[in-house]
Amino acid sequence: MKKIYTIAIALLVAATSFAQSGHRYSQVYSFNWQSSVPLGKPAEFIPSMGFNGANFNFGFFVTDNIAIGADFSWGYNQQTVDPEVYNIGDNCAVYAALYKTTQNIPMKAQFKYLFNPTGFVKVYAAAGLGATSYTEYIQIQEYQFSDSSWGFLMSPEVGIYVPFGKHSHWGANVAAGYNWATNKAQNLYFNVGLFFSVF
């Protein structure tokens, strides 16, 4: 936890240090690898952190500070349970390993606020509203069962844009957020990837 605070403070100091040395953005697009920590219903099914995710995000700036856009993610997690005897219906039982899989697809409109629009390293906070699709799969040999649901989604996020050079359109994007959904498909997520900006 101490290390996380140290990194966060260092990033904020860096953003302040470059306060007037960056370009204003008119558009920004990011492409990220996403990892997530399941909460609520997903954590009851598979409690471990998932590392198989992707994210695409874009925003159009209506002022120097404010962008309106959208965010799309896909997350996949899997767990293998050691072999044991399972009852698959009347008079039918199998001894096999059990494979659990979850798939989460959040889609949201997003409002983004840049705290330092002319800074070199740009720090932002965002809020999203939308919907999420969540599916749980269980497979035992050739038998497969699934449970799917849709839910209304609310999602706060914080992040930074770090360009590869003073006049570079490309850079690194790091973000963290929380997905809350009415179908109880909650998770904490972490994005690491690339962004492309239009000045």
Where are these regions (language model features)?
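Cleavable N-terminal export/targeting peptides
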Residues: 1-26
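Short glycine/proline- and aromatic-enriched beta-strand/turn motifs that initiate or cap beta-hairpins
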Residues: 20-68, 187-189, 195-199
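Residues that define the transmembrane beta-barrel architecture of outer-membrane proteins
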Residues: 25-27, 48-54, 101-107, 121, ...
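Gram-negative (and chloroplast) outer-membrane scaffold detector with strong preference
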Residues: 29, 37, 57-140, 162-168, ...
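Transmembrane beta-strand segments that form the barrel wall of outer-membrane beta-barrel proteins
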Residues: 29-48, 129-132, 170-182
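Extracellular loop and loop/strand-boundary signature of outer-membrane beta-barrel proteins
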Residues: 40-44, 92-99, 140-147, 177-181
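Outer-membrane beta-barrel translocator domains and adjoining extracellular loop/strand segments
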Residues: 41-49, 80-87, 135-144, 184-190
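Predominantly the C-terminal beta-signal and adjacent terminal strand-loop region
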Residues: 71, 75-83, 154, 159-199
